[in-house]
Amino acid sequence: MSSSASTIVAIASAAGIGGVGIVRLSGAQSVQIAAQLGIARMQPRHAHYARFRDGQGAVIDDGIALWFNAPHSFTGEDVVELQGHGSPVLLRQLVARCIELGARQARAGEFSERAFLNGKLDLAQAEAIADLIAAGDLRAARAARRALDGVFSRRVDAVADTLTRLRIHVEAAIDFADEPLDTLGGNQLRDGLGQARNVLAQLLRDAERGRKLRDGLHAVLIGPPNAGKSSLLNALAGSDRAIVTDVAGTTRDTLHEAIQLDGFELTLVDTAGLRDGGDAIEREGMRRARAELERADLALVVLDARDPQAARDAIGDAIDAVPRQLWIHNKCDLLGNAVSLDANAIAVSAVTGQGLEQLHIRLRALALGDGVDSVEGEFSARTRHVQALRRAEQHVDAADLELGFEQLELAAEELRLAHEALGEITGKLSADDLLGKIFSSFCIGK
């Protein structure tokens, strides 16, 4: 079923000048509008050479027209693509002519929205289109491609189906409330719930990895002045991004630099050194450093290997809330003897490069967690997906608790809420305002 009676049009090719430009139409009037442009007797899935004409019969451009008939198209509607020269002036003129003939300018993401509303793909797959377009590296692109192919959605649907079966079992038990739960297969029900919980937990871990692949991680370099934070950022970035001097307090503001770790993006944040005192500007820099820690995924505590206690005194409890930490003993080349370090510490020299390869390995492991080399089956995910999975997990845990007290009605409600949370991921249960927010972030021609 079509999502709208209107026919929409937009430039579908990338902005700017190019060899080829594409204008896309979708809706019931697409073929009629194409005919009025000068493209007669079109056949579905055949390329037609044509001259695209304005209202006075003058040629706007010439090129290829393609008709994808409903429902065998991306949107599920009649779709016509006009491929001409990649001149923004000509493409805008062609869009204007289509609007004169009855189409309207498409909203951002409206083609993908119609594909979703017409059942051509689910919401997670639609989001994967935007992720594929925006992918910053090959690994992220492949993960987005798998999400677009439905790898993520099928796993979500499998868990949702399991919860539905368990809920049916609980609802049936409610009808026999006078019977003890064990006589109604209560042990089997709890076992099934435990298995569903394990599958959901693994899916949540994989989705969190997918979110990291899509968004990257935020790693904050923190420590006392002159520990070598800026030198380390430059060494990891492979360029002189940060100013390095022997003067304590040189870094006054935060500096962000994205690096690639085997196809994974890690944003390093250089910050002002933490210490007591300092002038007003330096104190503001330290305030910003602590603010960066509040949203950090990873704290890289950089200290002078000759005086590690100074870093601990300067930092105090500033990094306690950061989930992952790595203590980096910099300037290890200045030590006469090797030092024994804890498991969450590493010795490096930003100047000589000693230990940097091992640091890359540790950063990669901290970024993606266990199984960093296992890319098979990776899919892209978003923060909202992870949040929905966490809610589902919480409701499954609550259902298990209620079953333990034989509170069947409450257990059934928790299972319903878990199922609802999963439905938000694929769009089977999504509010209109959520859909509007998601599709408005897409390109105009998608």
UniProtKB/Swiss-Prot annotation:
Return one Gene Ontology term, BP aspect. tRNA wobble uridine modification
Instruction: State the compartments where it is located.
Output: Cytoplasm
GO CC annotations, alphabetized? cytosol
Pfam families given in the database record:
MMR_HSR1 (PF01926), MnmE_helical (PF12631), TrmE_N (PF10396)
Sequence positions that bind GTP: 226-231, 245-251, 270-273
Q: What class of enzyme is it?
A: hydrolase
Give the TrmE-type G domain ranges. 216-368
Q: Which UniProt keywords apply?
A: Cytoplasm, GTP-binding, Hydrolase, Magnesium, Metal-binding, Nucleotide-binding, Potassium, tRNA processing
Domain of life of the native organism: Bacteria
Query: Any keyword tRNA processing?
Result: yes
Q: Where does (6S)-5-formyl-5,6,7,8-tetrahydrofolate bind?
A: 24, 81, 120, 446
Keyword GTP-binding attributed = yes
So where does K(+) get bound? 226, 245, 247, 250
Q: Which InterPro entries match?
A: G_TrmE (IPR031168), GTP-bd (IPR006073), GTP-bd_TrmE_N (IPR018948), GTPase_MnmE (IPR004520), MnmE_dom2 (IPR027368), MnmE_helical (IPR025867), P-loop_NTPase (IPR027417), Small_GTP-bd (IPR005225)
Q: Which cofactors does this gene product need?
A: K(+)
Which Gene3D superfamilies does this one have? P-loop containing nucleotide triphosphate hydrolases, Probable tRNA modification gtpase trme, domain 1, tRNA modification GTPase MnmE domain 2
Under Enzyme Commission nomenclature, its number is 3.6.-.-
Molecular function (GO) terms for this protein are: GTP binding; GTPase activity; metal ion binding
Chief site of localization? cytoplasm
**Residues reported in the UniProt entry to bind Mg(2+):** 230, 251
Q: How is the cofactor bound?
A: Binds 1 potassium ion per subunit.
Fill in the subunit field for this protein.
Homodimer. Heterotetramer of two MnmE and two MnmG subunits.
Question: Main role?
Answer: Exhibits a very high intrinsic GTPase hydrolysis rate. Involved in the addition of a carboxymethylaminomethyl (cmnm) group at the wobble position (U34) of certain tRNAs, forming tRNA-cmnm(5)s(2)U34.
Among NCBIfam families, the record links this protein to: mnmE_trmE_thdF, PRK05291.1-3, small_GTP
Protein name in UniProt: tRNA modification GTPase MnmE
Q: Which organism is it from?
A: Xanthomonas euvesicatoria pv. vesicatoria (strain 85-10)
